[in-house]
Amino acid sequence: MKTGGLSDFADFGEEDANCTQGIQWIKDVFTDCVDTDLKLLGFIIGLISLALWLIPLFPQLWQNYKTKKCEGLSLAFLFFWLVGDTCNMLGAILTNQQPIQKIIGVYYIIQDLVLWTQYGYYLKIYNRPTTSSARSNTIVVPVLALASVGSFFVFESALPPVGDHRVKRSFLESLNHQEGLPLEGILKMWPIFTSYTDMLGYIIGSMAAVCYFGGRIPQIIKNYRHSSCEGLSLTMFYIIVAANFTYGISVLLATTSWLYLLRHLPWLAGSLGCCCFDAVIISQYYLYRPKTPLAEDTERAGLLNSQDDSD
């Protein structure tokens, strides 16, 4: 392995394509070129982030099950989270990522759908009787998302297999070989994107980052209006902060050029930006948590002492 360093735009494509000094199994499984000590450290931290991302919803799901309530969750927060995970999933399919990345994308969506199911059940069915129309309004979003993901798998499996004379090529892949398209000048002007498929994956990744980033705002507003974070799992947000922070660090450690940093900017901003918003939610949790009798007595004594001093 060689030592790491930040270089210019020109070396990105060559280094990424060859990876002669990298660890081969990492490139085969994760398509990452790990050929420096810093990249190896970043890859290890990235694996930690990946492991953390497998479990963040479990504390919230368990709390919902124990309390039989989901009122503390903002519906907009859940919606943006589901849309963000769906965008990640579609991006992995459209850019033909490794199977492990597609499987993880499906896993995220399954977790989201379980959370949506809990939300609909405990809010609309468990605690009070409801009509079928009200139930359908609650579950329509996850059902549509699941149908969309399923349709992409059906479409992908319906494509002809690779053979001696037949090549399985999607519409997006065929676009990469077209000449004279309006966006061709953009690809040649500045080598941020290597193909139209690559550009579409970047756009979808940016949409996911915006959903993750902006989805926190409705939850923060709801906590502020109710002066309460009851129903939210503090453990979930701690895990999310740790996962986002370790992911951001892994990207920064793997950076070898300004172009690499620019290509990963949406995901980097989405992860580190979410840390800031999640820190606000965590601070709200401690600010709005119910006071213990001892704390109330101490606060009351302090007020009485201040009144005596003023007299």
UniProtKB/Swiss-Prot annotation:
Q: Name one GO molecular function term.
A: basic amino acid transmembrane transporter activity
Q: What is known of its domains?
A: The di-leucine motif mediates lysosomal localization.
Give residue spans on the Cytoplasmic membrane side: 59-74, 124-138, 211-233, 288-311
Q: Which gene encodes it?
A: laat-1
Taken from the UniProt entry, a GO cellular component term is: organelle membrane
Q: In chain numbering, where does the motif Di-leucine motif fall?
A: 303-304
This molecule's function is given as: Amino acid transporter that specifically mediates the pH-dependent export of the cationic amino acids arginine, histidine and lysine from lysosomes. May play a role in the degradation of autophagic substrates in autolysosomes by regulating lysosome function.
Keyword Hydrolase included in the entry's annotation: no
Q: How does it sit in the membrane?
A: Multi-pass membrane protein
Glycosylation, residue list: N18
An annotated GO BP:
lysine transport
Q: Any ranges marked Lumenal in the topology annotation, and which?
A: 1-37, 96-102, 160-189, 255-266
Q: Where in the cell is it found?
A: Lysosome membrane
Query: Which Pfam families did the record assign?
Result: PQ-loop
Give the family, as the similarity comment puts it.
Answer: Belongs to the laat-1 family.
Q: Which residues cross the membrane?
A: 38-58, 75-95, 103-123, 139-159, 190-210, 234-254, 267-287
Name of protein: Lysosomal amino acid transporter 1
| Phenotype upon loss of function | Mutants are viable but develop slowly. They accumulate enlarged lysosomes and show an impaired lysosomal degradation of phagocytic, endocytic, and autophagic cargos.
**Listed InterPro entries:** LAAT-1, PQ-loop_rpt
Q: Does the keyword ATP-binding apply?
A: no
